[in-house]
Regions:
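Initiator methionine at the very start of the polypeptide chain
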Residues: 1, 31-32
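Preference for short coil/turn "hinge" residues that link or interrupt alpha-helices
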Residues: 12, 16-19, 393, 408
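Bacterial N-terminal signal peptides that target proteins for export
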Residues: 2-14
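C-terminal His-loop and adjacent cap/lid subdomain of alpha/beta-hydrolase
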Residues: 33-153, 161-539
């Protein structure tokens, strides 16, 4: 098998997906009234809600009465020291963000729409407080701009979670909602993150603490140390994969038995991805293609065994890094360890996938060998009181009475497509219950379907190769991959769909919808498509 070299180092998306757009200066305390300035026919107002969360409002001179309330994604609640890949140099910020990016904000203002967004009073997992902040912010906006007639809400990642919760809990405030690349309920999400982090610890570096962090400064140091160790493992695997993709060596920090080390380390990483429910397509690896010019047997081996391992490498790196930060954050809030896999059967977790990915897992014997390590390794045990406290945090019922538009990439490695699918399934159950109740009451008209589900699919093949035949990770991430990896055209299509829903009381449908999606590019409406469930919900 030919040896391959990456054109450049592994691309990480986590930091860029989490850090937010800087739009305005940040108020330091709650202000009774917004402070406004007008320039270039746009009035910009800043202030802070009663919880001290800073906000920004922008309204054009030709304001048409509709405002877009945007909720930003997860921002770490602690600073990250410089030098740590992906997040290094991050400082905690509550800068308000009234839209996905400056281009989208400008386009909405040009169309006569207002935009508003909060920086929130607390960073990290802040859904409960953010919901209250946004409700107050809507009232402030309406008081300041009395011509407001409709409010639509949208957001990404954790902001998508917040958006869905607003639609469920406050349908009286909003005309339509669009949760994008949404996070799911926290327990399923932390199960995925915990499985990924525990898998890396178990196979590659048992000194990773992986949770149950100490209180105070000691716990912060442990979490930052884990980040360093995770990226050290990823760097070691990356070098090994590039040097010998067929049988890459194990990291020096691994303590698995020598007999297990006879199995390629790439197979262990693939197993980590599968057992956590992390996608097997990544920003640059489609899990199906091979470099041009390889002999047929080598090409088949690359397609079935090597490409999937590179995909797992990119995706697990992003999932595990966020897992460290989110675990530390949630443990601080809940008062103890929240991840528990004492009863998890990882063999059952991959019962279906192990055959589809047999070559990547080094066959039946390789799979069984790796699973034996998981079965014999010490498990993580949660603090019951902390788990109950975490369960009390905001969650989704799936019950919405206003038009709602869902959109996510099918190979998002952070908020996997299963996050969106869980809300789709909950709404389907709710709608069926409503229809059954209506029929029992003698009604013949079906309830309105208030949920429009859209998917950002990946191309069939998209891995690029250099002239030397090496995988090229310098090209942009493929559509449908990475975290919240959307184009301006896609954002504007969602914005247009929200405006239509707000004006008409229902989602766009039929030919008009399909034309809108086609023009935006890489947006799919397919009622027959169902994303894999998150592992928390079973296979």
């Amino acid at each position: 098998m030919r040896n391959f070299k990456f054109k450049r180092s592994l691309t990480l998306v986590a930091a860029s997906s989490l850090l937010s757009l800087t739009v305005v200066s940040i108020p330091t305390a709650a202000q009774a009234n917004p402070v406004c300035t007008t320039a270039n026919f746009v009035t910009t107002c800043v202030g802070a809600t009663t919880d001290t969360a800073p906000y920004s409002m922008m309204v054009p001179a030709n304001f048409n009465g509709t405002v877009y309330l945007y909720s930003h994604g997860y921002r770490p609640n602690v600073p990250v020291p410089a030098g740590i890949p992906g997040y290094g140099g991050y400082t905690v910020t509550n800068t308000p963000q009234p839209g996905p990016n400056a281009t989208v904000i400008g386009a909405l203002l040009a169309k006569g729409y207002g935009v508003v967004g909060s920086g929130f009073a607390r960073q990290g997992w802040n859904a409960d407080s953010a919901i209250k902040t946004n409700v107050e912010l809507v009232g402030i906006f309406k008081k300041q701009f009395t011509k407001t007639t409709k409010v639509v809400t949208w957001g990404e990642s954790l902001g998508g979670f917040i958006t869905q919760a607003l639609a469920e809990k406050h349908p009286d405030l909003f005309s339509a909602a669009a949760p994008l690349c949404m996070a799911s309920d926290i327990t399923p999400l932390m199960t995925m993150a915990g499985d990924a982090l525990w898998g890396i610890k178990t196979f590659f570096d048992p000194t990773i603490k992986g949770g149950n962090y100490s209180a105070g400064a000691a716990g912060y140091a442990e979490a930052m140390g884990d980040l360093v160790k995770v990226f050290t493992v990823i760097g070691s695997l990356q070098a090994a994969f590039a040097a010998n993709p067929s049988t890459p060596a194990w990291p020096a920090t691994s303590k698995v038995p020598d007999a297990i080390k006879a199995i390629p380390s790439r197979s262990a990483l693939v197993l980590v991805a599968l057992m956590a429910g992390i996608p097997m397509q990544s920003a640059h690896f489609d899990s199906t293609s091979a470099p041009p010019g390889l002999p047929a047997s080598n090409a088949l081996s690359f397609q079935l065994a090597i490409n999937p391992a590179f995909a797992a490498l990119e995706n697990v790196a992003n999932a595990a890094a966020l897992a460290v930060l989110a675990t530390h954050d949630l443990e601080l809030q809940a008062g103890g360890a929240v991840f528990d896999n004492t009863a998890t059967d990882y063999s059952a977790r991959v019962a279906d996938e192990q055959f589809a990915w047999s070559s990547a897992l080094s066959g039946v014997s390789g799979t069984q060998g790796l699973l034996s390590v998981l079965a014999a390794s010490p498990r993580a045990k949660a603090n019951p009181a902390a788990v109950e406290k975490m369960k009390a945090l905001a969650s989704h019922s799936g019950k919405v009475e206003i038009p709602t538009i869902l959109f996510t990439g099918v190979a998002d490695p952070v908020t996997t497509a299963g996050n969106q699918q869980s809300v789709v399934d909950k709404y389907a159950t709710y709608w069926a219950e409503k229809w059954a109740t209506a029929k029992k009451a003698g009604e013949r008209k079906r309830p309105a379907n208030n949920q429009l589900v859209l998917w950002n699919l990946t191309p069939e093949k998209y891995t690029k190769y250099t002239a030397a035949g090496a995988p090229d990770t310098s090209v942009p991430a493929a559509t449908g991959t990475n975290h919240c990896n959307f184009t301006t055209s896609q954002y504007m299509a969602i914005a247009d769909l929200l405006a239509y829903a707000a004006d008409n009381g229902k989602n766009m449908s039929g030919g008009a919808l399909l034309t809108k999606l086609r023009k935006a590019g890489n947006m799919t409406y397919d009622r027959g498509y169902s994303a894999p469930k998150m592992k928390y919900y079973g296979n």
